[in-house]
Amino acid sequence: MPVQVLKIIKGKPETQLPSHLQREDLKHLQTGLDHTNKYFQGIVILSYPLTKLGDGTDFFKIVLQDDTCSRINSINVLMYGKMAEDCAKLIRNGDTFIVAGFKVAESPTAREDGRHACHLQVSEESGSAIFICTQPSITPFSEATSPSVAPKYVYTPLNCLKDGTVVNLYGIVKFFKPPYISKGTDYCSVVTLVDQSNVKLTCTLFNGNLDSLPKIYKNGDIVRFHRVKIREYNGQMQGITSAGFASLTFDGTVGAPVVPRASSKVYTFVDEEQKTVEELRIWAASNLSVSGPEAKLSDVKPMMFFDLTCQLVGKAKVDGSSFLLKVWDGTKCPYPTWKVPVEAKELEGDRVLLHHLRNLTVDVLVYDNHVQLAKSLKTGSFLRIYSIHTKQASAKNEDMSSHIEFHLHGGTCYGRGIGILPENNPDVEELKSFLECVELTDSQNMESVSSLELGDTFDSYTDLESPLQRCQQLSATVLTDHQDMSNTVLKTVLNSSAPQQYRIRAKLRSFKPQKLYQSVKLHCSKCNTLQEVPNGDAIDFILQGCAATAPNPELQSMSWYESVVWTTEEDQGRKITIHFVKHYEMLQRPENTLLMIEGGTLKEIWKLTRRFKCVIPVKSKEDDLELLDLSAPFLLQGNIKYYGCKKCSTPKSIKNLSSLAEKREPSWEPTEIAQVLGIEPLQYVFVMKFTLVDGTGVLNAYLFDYEKFFQIPASEILTNSFLQQKMEMTMNTLSPPGRKLDDLPWLECFIKSYNVADGMKHQVYYQIFDTTVAEDVV
């Protein structure tokens, strides 16, 4: 039977393996050697879903770990046919896997996954045999697990990390950003670790599932990461997620129970590792200062940033860019607090409880990227809100005292974010015990000495004419910084000297250009010039002119690239030459390949960009290939054409690309390519003129933005019909055609004024900055 399941009795397989088989070490698995009568044994640490190949054959891949080798201690095993189907039903992480009759082949993914340079190929047709020693049903980490089944992992100290490796490690959290939604669909968390070597490692972790990221609650927590890929950047080692990434997190307090917070349902944790956690705790207590700026509401002061552990008792939508959280921690703020006016129908939470706690709760206004998570929170849950800002605001009315506002600003700087704490968290258990002892009687009957009540508890919008009222009106744009600045009316802006910066609130009366594709320009940051984006006909004209020159055969198939030439049937036998850049004298997969093309049309080049990493149009000269005129793109990648500035560029020899090809893992980033070729790259930018009004004045402000305002890359808008439609819908929302001025949405913007000299005249211009369209506008 090709696949056999063996029971483990007293740490050994119930059935003995055939006597002619001898165990092979991982380090001896090489192509060209005879592995007949040999078997390899390892622990299953990762398995992939069963799939079918193009011909319908079942395919199953697993990763085995061998603890006899310390540096690269894992290898891929590829199974085909019925053997793949059978193993996919039986195998679980932690099983002992024994394979004989395997074929050893080079692994094309070794550089990417950091595993063995070879992989094992297994199938029933080739006479392979598999023995699986299944582990008992999965138990919690604290229960006994057979030592013969539990894999023994090797952990790398932070001062021994090497570029390109995939490692397991332990570390103490020195800084972290709570998970947030990245520009794509994944969640992202940033963690900076340190260990006894005093070396720091910053890890950027991505996952589509929030629960699969480390459950870190505060600085000083201890983490165990499995399968972190190490990359060197600017001389510093950095960690990123790789396939099979998993984590455990522990409270870093000396003497606290060693209870892991796991990112996966199945994991191993042995006594030896408990000792590692305790050693890290003791070292951190003596050598690190990792306590965060935690505070209770009774300790807050104006103009401070702090972390708050609290319970959520109410929440409400405020406008397109902010969300209200009503929280308490059982203590009383010593200052009057701002109560955000919201409509009763918008407020979620127990009305009776909210009324009882009205003098103990504070209103935290959450902005921008934190809004989505805030909306999903359940009332009654326990939170840790990181980097809350307390701001003192003066009342407009003499009968009302100044008050404190609580803000969680947008962005993730300084670890801003919201963490949801489980009920068994020690800090939550302590808070719950404290809240149960809080006497509400005094709070209920006391006149609001410490709280600024703008109307009744569940009143509608206040009638006060103040910025607090105006902020409730839907704003179609979001401020990405400087939220502390107060609004300035346009009349004051227009009557003030330049240069200055302002926060304004206005409506978009009109904008130019009306044809939105005309707003995309090319900008040189060095000489600060703008130019139009060349159209396809202009580029084709340049390419056709170069195609008239025959390729130079002496420049084909050099040491660092391989060339292919063919002749077209049309265009009088036009010759096309493609030069494939090699890496370590080998051709790469298409998705990793840079190629250069001579004699191709724009249509042909676009076809190549769909399959290959990037394409550079070139032409032959006597002794070298060279770039085309910079009126044409010097590089095409995906749907984007990259241009260079004619004025600021000093084109260098195309041979300089070979220096990038010699890198361990060439990234072929456009900025790197431009640098070695002596090109000053032009950047795609939106340039528009907005006419803004607020009832006190009319102001023309220019939008000069690469991608932040529309949250659309200017580089992609011309080739992506979906993004074009999104931009058009956005502008129709900001300035709906045919609508009265009173019906237009408000825009909150930052603008800066600057002087421009025109001969003897000095004119003041205005530019929008640090502003973006609200997420729910389109």
Swiss-Prot record:
Principal place of residence: nucleus
Q: Determine the domain of life of the protein's source.
A: Eukaryota
Annotated GO molecular function terms are: G-rich strand telomeric DNA binding; single-stranded telomeric DNA binding; telomerase inhibitor activity; telomeric DNA binding
**Which GO cellular component terms are attached?**
chromosome, telomeric region; nuclear telomere cap complex; nucleoplasm
Q: Does the keyword DNA-binding apply?
A: yes
Q: Where in the cell is it found?
A: Nucleus; Chromosome, Telomere
Q: Which InterPro entries match?
A: NA-bd_OB-fold (IPR012340), POT1 (IPR028389), POT1_C_insert (IPR048953), POT1PC (IPR032042), Telomer_end-bd_POT1/Cdc13 (IPR011564)
**CDD domains per the UniProt record, alphabetical:** hPOT1_OB1_like, hPOT1_OB2, Pot1C
A Gene Ontology biological process term: telomere maintenance via telomerase
Instruction: Give the UniProt keywords, A-Z.
Output: Chromosome, DNA-binding, Nucleus, Telomere
- Residues annotated as coiled-coil are none
> Which family does the similarity line name?
Belongs to the telombin family.
What task does this protein carry out? Answer: Component of the telomerase ribonucleoprotein (RNP) complex that is essential for the replication of chromosome termini. Is a component of the double-stranded telomeric DNA-binding TRF1 complex that is involved in the regulation of telomere length by cis-inhibition of telomerase. Also acts as a single-stranded telomeric DNA-binding protein and thus may act as a downstream effector of the TRF1 complex and may transduce information about telomere maintenance and/or length to the telomere terminus. Binds to at least two telomeric single-stranded 5'-TTAGGG-3' repeats (G-strand).
**Subunit record text:** Homodimer or homooligomer. Component of the telomerase ribonucleoprotein complex. Binds single-stranded telomeric DNA as a monomer. Found in a complex with TERF1, TINF2 and TNKS1. Interacts with TNKS1.
PANTHER family, per this entry? PROTECTION OF TELOMERES 1 (PTHR14513), PROTECTION OF TELOMERES PROTEIN 1 (PTHR14513:SF0)
By what name is this protein known?
Answer: Protection of telomeres protein 1
